């Protein structure tokens, strides 16, 4: 967003955004996320290779639960519907929470995933690599950075 430009956002939202943006811990966390991009891409590729058609997310969910535990989340569980969740306690005493979410399933059937390829421009190709596997890998990177930076 261009500084000083009114994009129609709620003034309270803009104020909150500016405060978050100015926090040194947030800046450090964002730098960590950028620096760890190769690791995030590796996780994205790994998760994309675990086929998870809707209603059959067990294997991908089990691996994601492991990754959340490794990242330091507490209370990592899988609910009866196959959703995986965990908690990362913040360091502030604001009483506020942040939700970071994504979904495990893809629209692809078993057998559709043959591998991950990369084109000449560096784009990854694989059924489900972006929907929503990219978000799962990115969320994990953000959670790791938050944990390391004490956010």
Predicted regions located by residue number:
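Charged, low-complexity surface patches
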Residues: 36, 57, 135
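Active-site metal-coordination/substrate-binding segment of hydrolases
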Residues: 94-151
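Acidic active-site catalytic centers that drive phospho-/nucleotidyl reactions
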Residues: 42-43, 57, 105, 131
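A non-catalytic alpha/beta surface segment that caps or lines the substrate-entry region
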Residues: 43-46, 52-94, 115-118
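N-terminal hydrophobic or amphipathic helices/low-complexity stretches enriched
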Residues: 1-49
């Amino acid at each position: 967003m261009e500084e000083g430009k009114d994009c129609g956002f709620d003034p309270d939202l803009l104020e909150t955004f500016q405060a978050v943006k100015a926090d040194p811990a947030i800046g450090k966390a964002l730098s960590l996320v950028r620096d760890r991009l190769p690791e995030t891409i590796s996780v994205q590729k790994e998760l994309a290779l675990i086929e998870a058609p809707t209603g059959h997310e067990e294997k991908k969910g089990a691996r994601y639960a492991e990754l959340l535990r490794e990242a330091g989340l507490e209370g990592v569980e899988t609910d009866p519907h196959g959703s995986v969740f965990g908690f990362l306690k913040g360091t502030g005493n604001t009483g506020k929470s942040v939700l970071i979410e994504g979904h495990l399933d893809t629209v692809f059937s078993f057998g559709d995933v043959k591998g991950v390829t990369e084109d000449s421009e560096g784009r990854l190709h694989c059924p489900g690599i972006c929907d929503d596997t990219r978000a799962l890998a990115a969320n994990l990177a953000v959670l790791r950075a938050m944990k390391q930076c004490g956010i």
